[in-house]
Amino acid sequence: MNSNVENIYQLEGRVPVSKAIPFGLQHILAMFVANIAPIIIVAGACGLSSGGMAMLIQSAMIIAGIGTIIQLYPVWRLGSGLPIVMGISFTFVSIFCYIGPTYGYEAIIGAVLIGGLAEGVLGLLAKYWTKLITPVVAASVVTAIGFSLLSVGAASFGGGSGSADFGSAKNLILGGITLACCIGFNIFAKSFWKQLSVLFGLVAGYVVAVAMGMVDFSTLSDASVIALPKLMPFKPVFHPGAIVSVFLIFLVSATETIGDTSALASSGLGRDVKAKETAGSIACDGFISSLSAVFGCLPITSFSQNVGLVAMTKVVNRFTLLMGAIIMILAGLFPIFGTLLATLPDAVLGGCTIMMFGTIVVSGIQMISRCGYSQRNISIVALSLSVGIGFTQVPEIFSIFPQIIQNVFAENCVAVVFLVAIVCNLILPKDMESKNEKAD
């Protein structure tokens, strides 16, 4: 097959490797920080050592590469065949930051193992249930996810919850400098370079942290140069409350995957997504997340920022993204890389992510706008967000319920919003506007 650089705008076809690598690398750089940030946040909340965090970062890069390859080139019914980039999901961060300190990191692994298998099966059966999750339900959930992550970003900005110097001047200054670098790069950078604003902020913030003496390099001396990821580094614990709550978030993740897959087909290929592509995308999400748990890592999902990059550049060639996925896997084979990233101060991460989390809120609001402000949609969004966010601010309100219900819902606003939105969507009449007009 002849290689042609013009094939970068075609799904099929070979592109010269010298051209494919930089375009593929661009996709990896666009999602790099978002891929490792959930690991650093959750590992910190669970009290894992820097060595354990480095191991998880290594696994995250390898799993993200594997997941991306399967999305590009489906295996059986797993994968969409579309240029979808996979990475560690932010959707689960808030619930993991509750499960980890409460039941241990092993309970997270057990819940991901079961939840991923369940989502994978649901993906294979997608045509029977996806109609339940309408755009307004997905929009409500995405908005709730953004709100739930704001406190996580703020905690990192202050130096990490529980740290001895939390909220100190040096942490706030470091977080502020990092945030300013992200914003400045986003303002002055041109074209697709804007997609790398978070990466620029991370590098700039890290350099400043080194200059301020806030980085501990002692762990680098023990890091191997090359190593394979470990199988089952954490023995899974299957806690019922953790499994149920994580399964609910897997359903939320599935709705995001549906949206990303549809958006990519529309913006990148100029057509509607096929049912087979949606089902394969969700199945890949679930089963590869379970594989991720086998390596002690967190769930993966499709990355919206890469969907945005496709929409902007129109680079949809699968071979080009394959080059990026291979680079990601190779990077994961060098533990020194993960160990270096594990030395990243919390304040730098907070400066990078605080605006990113706010962007998720805005994305949810934009999704609500696209659904339209009908009386029915307003009722679904208003009730689900007010109950979900409001009730979980006073978790004692759930005290009359069984412990498993409290474990799942009392401090998990995303799960509550998802449940209330689904129920409202099922019971509210489709013709609320016409009924109101007749009443008038």
Regions found by a protein language model. Give the residues of each.
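Hydrophobic, membrane-embedded alpha-helices of multi-pass small-molecule transporters
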Residues: 18-30, 167-179, 196-197, 212, ...
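Short, non-helical or kinked segments that cap or interrupt transmembrane helices
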Residues: 55-56, 77-90, 131-140, 194-199, ...
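Helix-boundary and loop/linker segments of multi-pass membrane transporters
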Residues: 9-16, 232-241, 274-275, 374, ...
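Short juxtamembrane and helix-loop transition motifs at transmembrane-helix boundaries
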Residues: 14-23, 42-52, 68-78, 98-107, ...
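N-terminal signal-anchor module of multipass membrane proteins
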Residues: 1-84, 91-99
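Membrane-embedded alpha-helical modules
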Residues: 99-219, 323-325, 329-437
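Membrane-embedded helical hairpins/re-entrant loop segments and their flanking transmembrane helices
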Residues: 17, 43-79, 247-318, 438-439
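Intrinsically disordered, low-complexity non-transmembrane regions of multi-pass membrane transporters
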Residues: 1-23, 217-231, 266, 270-273, ...
